[in-house]
Amino acid sequence: MKKRIMISTAILVLTACVLAGCSSASSADKDHLARVKEAGKITVATEGAWAPFTYHDADTNELTGFDVEVAREIAKRLGVEAEFAEGDFDGGLTGVSRGTFDMMANGVDVTPDRGQTFDFTDPYAFDRAVVVTKAGNSDIGSFDDLKGRTTANSVGSTYAQMGEEHGATVVNVPTLGETMELVKNGTADATINANTSVQDYLNTTGDTSLQIVATDEEVTMYAIPLKKGADNDSLREAINGAIADMKKDGTLSSISVKFFGSDITKE
């Protein structure tokens, strides 16, 4: 009898292990989109300090902005909730590349270098880079004039890279407001930034101590970066589908007008 009990127990344990293994294998076999849907949420990296793309409302302190609301709408159309993780720009990109975050919504522009690390969705907005200096400045009138100068930008941003490519020394600053302060007090000679953000800053603050002195000829395309690999193919397709539907039904345009006063979703 004792022997039979031991054999029966062994069979039960073996059966449990096999079932657990099957369950684990089943979970491992699911791609990124399936895991997101199973979790009921999609984690979104964002700065929360770069108006009007991602920032906190002054009255409610609620996280909002063009990219934030676009991400929320995408999540809604995927049938899940958007869970935001705030941090610096470079950390957000690193988190996506390592799989810590599912995606990033933060005015991330598509570049060849980033294309080696990330799989991008279709672009959902378009912009141009501009050079901003103190009003009255006559020494800097183009991107080439930044050589030997100091610019203020977020670490890891395309704008910081542009500054370095034009021979500038880049000071890393976490927020747009701090960036502008460094330019105004002379700590930085200039900043390269998104035209939309600069225009919003100038209009919102009424600041007349700054000026735009140059605009990049190339159009900046904003898209959502995902960790590179086939595991993300279905998620990218689903997000692309959501973006296409948002363009078609006017939702994307409405969000743009709400935060920029114009439609930047068309090239």
What does each model-found stretch correspond to?
Residues 72, 76, 81-145:
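Acidic, polar ligand-binding/catalytic clefts
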Residues 126-133, 199, 203-241, 262-267:
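Periplasmic-binding protein-like
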Residues 28-105:
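Extracytoplasmic small-molecule ligand-binding "clamshell" domains
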Residues 46-51, 63-76, 127-177, 195-197:
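Bilobed "Venus flytrap"/periplasmic-binding protein-like clamshell domains
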Residues 23, 68-77, 157, 221-262:
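Extended ligand-binding regions for polar small-molecule ligands
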Residues 84-94, 138, 156-157, 171-185, ...:
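Short helix-initiation/N-cap motifs at beta->coil->alpha
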Residues 16-21:
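C-terminal motif of bacterial Sec signal peptides marking the signal peptidase cleavage site
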Residues 108-116, 162-165, 189-219:
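A ligand-binding cleft/hinge motif common to bilobed small-molecule-binding domains
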